[in-house]
Amino acid sequence: MPFQQHEQTGLVWFTADVLNDVPHGFSTRKGGVSPAPWDSLNLRPGQGDGPEKLLENYRRFFAVLGLDETRAVLSQQTHTANIRTVTAEDAGKGLLRPRDYTDVDALITNVPGLPLTVFSADCGTVLLYDPVHQAIGAVHAGWRGCAAGIVEKTVAAMGAAYGSRPADLLAALGPCIGPCCFETDGDVPEAMRAALGAITNAYITVKGPKFHVDLAGLNRQWLLRAGLLPERIEVSGICTACRPDLFWSHRKMGDQRGVQVAVISLKEGL
């Protein structure tokens, strides 16, 4: 199995075998302290559960990953294809310090000990690791970001900033809404076809007047188009909307919910 489920002190999370050499994880809703409707491991700032519970949830999740939550760098997602190059000065932004950036759906860095953190409650998340140049990326890739090519653009940004070669990169695509549940109107397939071309049709099923879209499959196609090798890409295959016991799903729950995170960090002291 390319993805592993872990449980410790009530926390449940997933990791990808392809990223075993770096601290990383995909959270679930299990193991935190937030009350309903954010029960219980909500990691979304600014919700009704309050900052104290949010910080405790981060402390718990980052502890099982061996990471320091006080150095986490959080995205500021608005379904864009914008990428931020993270430096040591960004440590703690979004959690302990205000973010001085907006409209950022992907983060990259080569600084050890800076956990890059992106959010999801159905959207795709992609974690990237360059073992040659010791660089990482974290991407929020919902359908708008997917259609805008954020995954391919993040790979290119890592190349420009750190010399990362696509063939060296390792990638893990976390739990997201699956084609079983991601039912859309025609605008989503049209946007995907405009971006990716005919290959899109393999990831879209027509059901009457509606379309079912394989978001993870399309994000994987962007990775392949960017030059990643198929054997260096792992996909969770887990649908967030099918598992309300484990995940929050915007499609199933609306706005009154928490969010999961995908986080990756470079080891310190190497």
Question: Predicted regions span which residues?
Answer:
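Active-site microenvironment for binding and transforming phosphate-containing groups
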Residues: M1-L270
